[in-house]
């Protein structure tokens, strides 16, 4: 990743790191780069989630886009995948989403989509970064009729909702509990599930600019678990702040994570002959139980680096149509080009309705192994070379021998901090504690910063 762009756009504390000045420049330089091959006036969609800083950054970003002659369609509050969908179907030059996803309200972010609805390629991001770092802004400064125009486009939300409904099935007789995280899904999820004829109960639907992801949503599903039990709902659905991920809750109040959601949808598609190459794309963080369930079902798997952009890259390069992460990013390429929490929720409910099975029955086919992750602070120069240390390599090999295939160890560096992540999965909590703690002790002794 570059100096400004991470794996999911530009992020930082709003008005401190991600300032209006930077947002203006991102609009100006990003709009210029993405419109270079347009023969007509470029059209760009802009949306945001419900953070208090969203309107400030939106105004600055739009000013930058207008300054290079872009026709801006202002969508207001909308889910990230809604931007991706509209860019493709309305033939726009690009889309921009202002959100920090599952992060707290003080953070925000800006991410771009190309005219194909996919996140920008690395070379495009680097081109924008080069303009940001240039000593002088030498881009054209049109005036009068050369300036961009601004169009309020609330119809975008309705079009996205209509699209979501067309992917589903009649949910009459089903009760669905929704947690919209006081975020972008708060403007759409209720209407979508009512249009599908579900009975609904909703929490996290009163955003005030400061409460996005605060004790609600996919990273805090506890309130949803209680709501499911209180209402007797058939399933619960928790989205994050920009609604690009989903965590589900079964009718007993148990969490159903991204691994299980992918398995349920993947098995359904596979049995109908609709799973491309009979393969699901996942990452090294997916649970061993998920891998074993796929093997038992005869479904292939392709492993991508951690991060939904890398899952998408693997899907695009090899022609797969289903992939995702344990965290709840699920990409169903037949419908959209990025993770879409509401779309995934609708497909999950569709499988339940068409199979006549409860979510707990469907999820039971994946036995989730206990998992433990420990972060160890190490010298930054050593985090990528840990496996070169004989004592560390030897203890990992010893633990893997003891597992005899009934467990998994993953040791990897953090992409952003001087940390080494030690993760293990095993059939029992006691065993997983033993494996992780044994390896972590050796890592701390050999390269830990606290020595």
Swiss-Prot record:
One BP term from GO: carbohydrate metabolic process
The keyword Phosphoprotein is assigned to this record: yes
Ranges that cross the membrane: none
Cellular component annotations (GO), alphabetically ordered: cytosol
Residues where Phosphoserine is found: 101
Catalysed reactions listed for this entry: alpha-D-glucosamine 1-phosphate = D-glucosamine 6-phosphate
Post-translational modification summary for this protein: Activated by phosphorylation.
Major enzyme class: isomerase
InterPro entries: A-D-PHexomutase_a/b/a-I (IPR005844), A-D-PHexomutase_a/b/a-I/II/III (IPR016055), A-D-PHexomutase_a/b/a-II (IPR005845), A-D-PHexomutase_a/b/a-III (IPR005846), A-D-PHexomutase_C (IPR005843), A-D-PHexomutase_C_sf (IPR036900), A-D-PHexomutase_CS (IPR016066), Alpha-D-phosphohexomutase_SF (IPR005841)
Cofactor(s) recorded in Swiss-Prot or TrEMBL: Mg(2+)
HAMAP family: GlmM_B
Name of the protein described by the UniProt record: Phosphoglucosamine mutase
Gene that specifies this protein: glmM
């Amino acid at each position: 990743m570059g100096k400004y762009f991470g794996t999911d756009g530009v992020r930082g504390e709003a008005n401190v790191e991600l300032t209006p000045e930077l947002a203006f420049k991102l609009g100006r330089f990003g709009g210029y780069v993405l419109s270079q091959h347009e023969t007509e006036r470029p059209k760009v969609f802009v949306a945001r989630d419900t953070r208090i800083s969203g309107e400030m950054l939106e105004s600055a970003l739009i000013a930058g886009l207008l300054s290079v002659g872009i026709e801006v369609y202002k969508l207001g509050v909308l889910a990230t995948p809604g931007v991706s969908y509209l860019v493709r179907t309305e033939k726009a030059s690009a889309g921009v989403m202002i959100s920090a996803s599952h992060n707290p309200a003080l953070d925000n972010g800006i991410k771009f989509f190309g005219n194909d609805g996919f996140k920008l390629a690395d070379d495009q991001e680097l081109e924008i970064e080069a303009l940001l770092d240039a000593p002088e802004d030498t881009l054209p400064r049109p005036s009068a009729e050369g300036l961009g125009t601004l169009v309020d486009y609330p119809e975008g939300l309705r079009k996205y909702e209509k699209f979501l409904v067309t992917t589903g099935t009649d949910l009459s007789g089903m009760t669905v509990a929704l947690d919209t995280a006081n975020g972008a899904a708060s403007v759409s999820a209720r209407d979508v599930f009512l249009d599908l004829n579900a009975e609904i109960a909703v929490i996290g639907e009163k955003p005030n600019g400061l409460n996005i992801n605060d004790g609600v949503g996919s990273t805090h599903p506890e309130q949803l678990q209680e709501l499911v039990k209180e209402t007797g709902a058939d399933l619960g659905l928790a989205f994050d702040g920009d609604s690009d991920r989903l965590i589900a809750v079964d009718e007993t109040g148990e969490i159903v994570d991204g691994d299980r959601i992918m398995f349920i949808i993947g098995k359904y598609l596979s049995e109908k002959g609709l799973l491309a190459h009979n393969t699901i794309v996942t990452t090294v963080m997916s649970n061993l139980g998920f891998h074993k369930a796929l093997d038992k079902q005869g479904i292939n798997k392709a492993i991508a680096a951690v991060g939904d952009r890398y899952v998408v890259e693997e899907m695009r390069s090899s022609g797969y149509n289903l992939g995702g992460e344990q965290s709840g990013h699920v990409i169903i390429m037949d419908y959209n080009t990025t993770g879409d929490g509401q779309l995934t929720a609708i497909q999950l409910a569709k499988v339940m309705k068409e199979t006549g099975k409860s979510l707990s029955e469907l999820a039971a086919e994946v036995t989730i192994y206990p998992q433990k992750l420990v972060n160890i602070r190490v010298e930054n120069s050593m985090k990528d070379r840990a496996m070169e240390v004989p004592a560390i390599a030897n203890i990992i090999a010893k633990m893997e021998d003891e597992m005899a295939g009934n467990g998994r160890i993953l040791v990897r560096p953090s992409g952003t901090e001087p940390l080494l992540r030690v993760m293990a999965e095993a059939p029992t909590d006691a065993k997983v504690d033993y494996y992780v703690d044994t390896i972590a002790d050796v890592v701390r002794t050999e390269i830990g910063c606290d020595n």
